[in-house]
Amino acid sequence: MEQNLPSRITKLIKKSESGDFASSYQLYKVFGSKEYGVEPDEKMSDYFKELSAKQLEGGQLRVADIHLENYKGFESLIMDFSMKKNSTILVGNNGCGKSTILDAIQKGLTHLSSRLSTRSHNGDGIEKHELRKGQNYASIAINYDYMGIRFPMIIATTEPGYEDRAKSNYSGINELGSIFKTAHSINPNVSFPLIAMYTVERANDVSTRDIENSEEIKEAQIWDKFKAYNKSLTGKADFKLFFRWFKELIEIENSDNADITALRAEIRAKEKDLDNPLLKALLAENKNSETTKKLLEDHQNSLKVLKEKLNSYYSVNSKTLHTVEDAMYSFLPGFSNLKLQRAPLDLIVDKNNVSLSVLQLSQGEKTILALIADIARRLTLLNPNSVNPLDGTGIVLIDEIDLHLHPSWQQNIIPRLEKTFKNIQFIVTTHSPQVCHTIDSQNIWLLKNGQKFKAPKGVRGAISSWVLENLFEVAQRPPEDKYTKLLQEYKNLVFSEKYASEDARKLGATLSQHFGPDDETLVELKLEIEKRIWEDDFEKDQ
């Protein structure tokens, strides 16, 4: 059907032909409906749908925003996730609604997952008991973003007789799922996005049973991309399935070429080149010079060539195995040489050159191992043709990300997640200042009394006690503690000019003995006393 098309449509066609997904998608919509002032043309609509499917590669899937109405404790909440960085942190007291927001997003993701991986349009709904008390309807509205296009959805439920108050609508994600399926029919190796949720139950102990029972999983496993969505939103990393999968990969790996081992060692050495402290300092001093830019460009190009060469050597299974290993080693410093033990059946890893069963690791180490292994396994299945499957896109929700982690690990968890999984959007909850002070304030939401608030400026890089007091609204010292009260009493004596009294001297000595003379507050009070004595002496001399 020939049409005289408006200039805005011809401009879209030019952009579409140059590879712009957003333009192709808009044209698919334009020719498929009368809403846009152009005569519908089914053939043209199908053409641009297929073209947009071919242009999917390289995009990032994101939750752009969410709107809750009468869902659990929230009357109305709109939360924007279109931040600069990939991670968003939700903080607040117990019961403030952090997990409720993750649950709401998870419900939406079940609908998206089914549209990507199956022919059904199943997904979780809002249960009657999840309606806010006294209300007759509830809804969860989510906007997903893919390559600049918004794909909306609404999950709603109503009491009988109030059906007009809210209605579910899945048209946006139906279209997104349809485009991905079209892309898969054109190219079965096209990358799909990861969708996963990890609740506090992910920390359930990795046990001997997980290893022993892995044999219950039948031999005939087809590890295709759609298996990556299996149980991805149930909340727990499936270590039993991971062990079975890892065991099969190792059995295949045993027949691999020695060239792969040498090439991988060369790549690791190349990647470590820029970590040299002296070289880092030199590059930082001359970061804008042409020589520095050329050096970095040459380094990246040579690394790319090596990785492409490695990719050509690899079987899919061998590449997958090393991808998962590398991900785990990046999170567990000092760990290496993950291997299978046949009798008794076990998974062994070297920790600081000492071989240990994974069952002997600390709870925090096992929690990280299971989490990272699960994410990496799913990404490798979803990105079968990628040089680095860990660069795949997706959305991952993690409740209480600090669970079982030492404070130093809490401090590193978000930066390492972002470094290892560069294109994943992480939405996490935490009670830890150590997690928060590695993230810009604009990426943190504070929840309180059913409302959201932006974090105060300066969280990133701040000392933990400042974050504790200014973000979490927790006093730096326990207010009801005996020594906190004594310290406040001593402070009052100093600032009321009674620092020379017997009570003040005794109190100062007691506190110095308890906290040590280098306590920050005691040092400040000592300087304050010296200043006041100097001022008194100065006045006497006048």
UniProtKB/Swiss-Prot annotation:
One of its GO terms (biological process) is double-strand break repair. It comes from the Bacteria. One of its GO terms (molecular function) is ATP hydrolysis activity. SMART domains: AAA. The keyword Membrane does not apply. Probable ATPase component of antiviral defense system retron Ec83, composed of a non-coding RNA (ncRNA), a reverse transcriptase (RT), this protein and a putative HNH endonuclease. Expression of retron Ec83 confers protection against bacteriophage T2, T4 and T6. At multiplicity of infection (MOI) of 0.02 cultures slow growth when infected with T4 but do not collapse, at MOI 2 cultures enter growth stasis. This is Retron Ec83 probable ATPase. It comes from Escherichia coli.
